[in-house]
């Protein structure tokens, strides 16, 4: 499994090839399509820094309150993570309009999605901090079959043609994932909230806000395929392919130069004679 922990992001982990580190860095520098203030629904008269600074303070306060309650045995960890932390984060900080989920049925398969956003276009699986995002649990499965929260979200976006992206979180970690038929090769962006807030990492928070704010996953022209995040992904893939092409041409040029120099060396007269006589071509 490919993992990338870029030094530019201390609390953001890139697993697989969902989005490159460069895309995240470009987002932080406002160098991607759809990064005008109006594209983020920022009111006239306010700047990006003013908005993100306000949301940073709200998130800090919510996280602190969540941490004060998380160890209490008399509270339901599932409800605590949702009500005290994740739903306020998603609605008040990131701007989503969240709807309680219902069990989705596709064919003979059931998907107990906990919440949805953007009129069902973005499924959310939100659970308590005592859930491991990668560990199977009957509450996310079907008829005795266990699923992990991550597995539930991934299987659902793979099966549902109207969805491309999903969000999964247990309150401590949040993952952004996309339709990915290669179930054996996970691909997602993970945010470590504990590290982010304990290290007071505003720069990482700003990147998370620019990446996950509700306008990034909102369908455009009624099509989820045209959302800004999908455009960023495609742009990153195009740039990656061009970089590989340049690398391939560079390697070929280097090999040609190496071969030419080797043949031209004064001690390789015998080799030059064999090449000119066609001896090596017949080997």
Annotate each predicted stretch with a short phrase.
Residues 1-74, 121-283:
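Short, basic/polar, glycine-containing "phosphate-handling" surface segments that engage DNA
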Residues 31-40, 44-47, 94-121:
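Active-site metal-binding core of divalent-cation-utilizing nuclease and nuclease-like domains
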Residues 72-101:
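Acidic-basic catalytic patches of nuclease active cores, encompassing PD-(D/E)XK
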């Amino acid at each position: 499994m490919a993992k990338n922990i870029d030094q530019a992001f201390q609390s953001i982990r890139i697993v697989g090839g969902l989005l490159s580190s460069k895309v995240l860095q470009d987002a932080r520098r406002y160098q991607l399509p759809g990064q005008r203030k109006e594209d983020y629904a920022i009111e006239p008269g306010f700047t990006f820094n003013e908005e993100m600074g306000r949301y940073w303070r709200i998130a800090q306060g919510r996280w602190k309150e969540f941490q004060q309650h998380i160890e209490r045995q008399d509270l339901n960890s599932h409800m605590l993570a949702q009500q005290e932390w994740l739903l306020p984060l998603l609605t008040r900080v990131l701007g989503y309009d969240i709807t309680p989920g219902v069990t989705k049925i596709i064919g003979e398969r059931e998907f107990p999605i906990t919440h949805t956003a953007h009129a069902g276009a973005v499924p959310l699986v939100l659970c308590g901090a005592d859930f491991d995002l990668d560990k199977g649990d009957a509450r996310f499965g079907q008829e005795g079959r266990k699923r992990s929260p991550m597995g539930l979200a991934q299987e659902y976006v793979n099966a549902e043609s109207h969805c491309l992206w999903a969000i999964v979180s247990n309150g401590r970690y949040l993952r952004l994932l996309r339709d990915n038929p290669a179930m054996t090769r996970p691909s997602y962006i993970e945010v470590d909230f504990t590290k982010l807030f304990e290290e007071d990492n505003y720069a990482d928070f700003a990147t998370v806000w620019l990446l996950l704010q509700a306008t990034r996953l909102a369908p455009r022209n009624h099509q989820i395929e045209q959302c800004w995040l999908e455009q960023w992904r495609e742009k990153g893939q195009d740039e990656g392919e061009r970089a590989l092409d340049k690398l391939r041409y560079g390697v070929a040029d280097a090999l040609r130069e190496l071969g030419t120099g080797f043949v031209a060396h004064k001690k390789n007269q015998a080799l030059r004679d064999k090449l000119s006589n066609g001896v090596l071509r017949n080997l």
